[in-house]
Amino acid sequence: TAYLGQPGDGTSPADRFNDFQNSLTTLVNMPSSNGAQTSVALAAEDLVRSVKGAATTLSTTLNDVNMEIRYEVADLNTALYQLRDLNASGSGFTPGSLEAAQFDEKVDTILDQISGIVDTRIHRSSNGSISLYTVSGAALLEGRVVQDVTFNPSDGTLMAGNQDITPFKDGVRGIQHGSLAGLSELKRE
């Protein structure tokens, strides 16, 4: 309604259609009236302008949402590769040392960033390596193997490697929370 207006505000496509319909009713009752004929033509022009304006606004909004999803996917992949690199470097620091605390802080910061984008489940192996999965079980990172997340703007599909993680899609291990789920919901609407 922010883009289309509210019914009754005088500017929404619904109001323009109502004006057009009313002008047609008047024309039916007074077919020879030049004023009624002109009124229909003007109301039709207003309706077309209103619908075109709404379509342009919605198209721009869809493009903006697609761009935001691309940014979030890029940020997610960057964070997954950073986490993979930390896995590869290992945390062979003395427990309780400054280096160990700094390493853990880096890992926690990256995990916080990722969990803001997608809902995750973390598994730490006995050697300290981190594997990361969506809550529904799709792998994002397993040790040193990153499942690149991709986005297809034409149909809204999100993939982690070969696994479909598109939110709100039946039969897939879709993400449920985080900014990608929210943006996907916005795209669907």
What positions do the PLM features span?
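Structural signature of extracellular appendage/secretion-system components
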Residues: T1-E189
